[in-house]
């Protein structure tokens, strides 16, 4: 998958270790994106089926290989198929860290804790944080001290989801002009909370899932930000789906108008060396905020901002 004409030069910067700034990290992310195949299938199921001989988590484990004698893993993007959105951003993060870490700043213990495990539910361990509802990757980066997050919210459309009496749903023009869009850099990670108000749902105002019948539940997308189209639409890479034929979906570039997003979290990694702190994040370590978003409750905007360090 070729995204930029400078992809080979970007990869050379990462692999050579000629890194001087956070911008170079973002270039490693873009080079990592470029190493992934196109499509490969979109699948969120927990068991193989007639369309997919393995699940996404099984595919991730095949792609992430580290034996007992290895100080760091290898990650083979071609094996990480099928996929879904948060598996794609997790996989790109791992690949980018491997491209960036030419000086072995990240310990074997940290790498081992980054291994994706099917036993890690949302909010548990490294993978369980990256895969969680809400701002999972943003919380993970904040916990590790590896970067910063910014967030913006258009407001709830319905009274039932408003957090205060003075909360207002911004017009398309106001939302498109929000300063958050100017602060995102290609190679940043984004969590997009979809605006589904035209269909009668206010799910874009909701953070997490509470499994209460009749309540709106979060509908979001974990992506790598690539920039903007000439008309201002958001351009991103992820595993995009579902659709009519999930076998022909998966890794791809997508775009959407800003009006299709109701809430956004932008995660900007500035200290990739701090991913070594994952050595203190074993598979059974729990982030209760994230684990609660997996069927127990919704979060408020204020709670989310605290958890991602963006108060």
Predicted regions and their residues:
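...with weaker cross-activation on analogous glycine-rich loops/strands in unrelated enzymes
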Residues: 110-244
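Positively charged n-region of N-terminal signal peptides that target proteins for export
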Residues: 1-5
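Bacterial N-terminal signal peptides
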Residues: 7-14
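N-terminal capping segments
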Residues: 18-144, 299-311
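Low-complexity, Gly/Ser/Thr/Pro-rich intrinsically disordered linker/tail segments
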Residues: 233-311
């Amino acid at each position: 998958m070729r995204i930029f004409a400078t992809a080979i030069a970007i990869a050379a910067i990462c692999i050579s270790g000629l890194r001087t700034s956070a911008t170079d990290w973002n270039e490693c992310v873009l080079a990592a994106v470029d190493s992934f195949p196109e499509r490969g299938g979109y699948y969120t199921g927990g068991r193989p089926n007639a369309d997919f001989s393995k699940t996404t988590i099984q595919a991730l484990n095949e792609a992430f290989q580290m034996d007992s004698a290895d100080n760091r893993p290898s990650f083979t993007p071609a094996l990480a198929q099928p996929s879904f959105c948060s598996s794609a951003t997790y996989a790109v993060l791992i690949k980018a860290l491997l491209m960036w870490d030419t000086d072995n700043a990240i310990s074997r213990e940290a790498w081992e804790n980054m291994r994706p495990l099917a036993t890690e539910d949302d909010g548990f361990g490294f993978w369980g944080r990256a895969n969680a509802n809400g701002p999972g990757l943003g919380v993970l980066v904040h916990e590790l001290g590896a970067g910063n997050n910014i967030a913006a919210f258009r407001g709830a459309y319905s009274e039932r989801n408003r957090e205060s009496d003075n909360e207002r749903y911004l017009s398309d023009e106001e939302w498109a002009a929000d300063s958050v869009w100017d602060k995102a850099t290609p190679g940043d990670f984004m969590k997009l909370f979809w605006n589904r108000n035209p269909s009668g749902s206010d799910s874009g105002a909701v953070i997490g899932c509470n499994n209460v019948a009749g309540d709106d539940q979060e509908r979001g997308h974990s992506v790598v930000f690539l920039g903007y189209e000439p008309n201002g639409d958001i351009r991103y890479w992820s595993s995009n789906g579902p659709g009519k034929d999930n076998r022909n979906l998966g890794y791809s570039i997508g775009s959407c108008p800003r009006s299709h997003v109701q809430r956004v979290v932008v995660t900007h990694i500035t200290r990739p060396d701090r991913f070594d702190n994952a050595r203190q994040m074993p598979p059974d370590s729990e982030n209760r905020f994230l684990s609660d978003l997996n069927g127990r409750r919704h979060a408020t905007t204020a709670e989310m901002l605290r958890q991602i360090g963006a108060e």
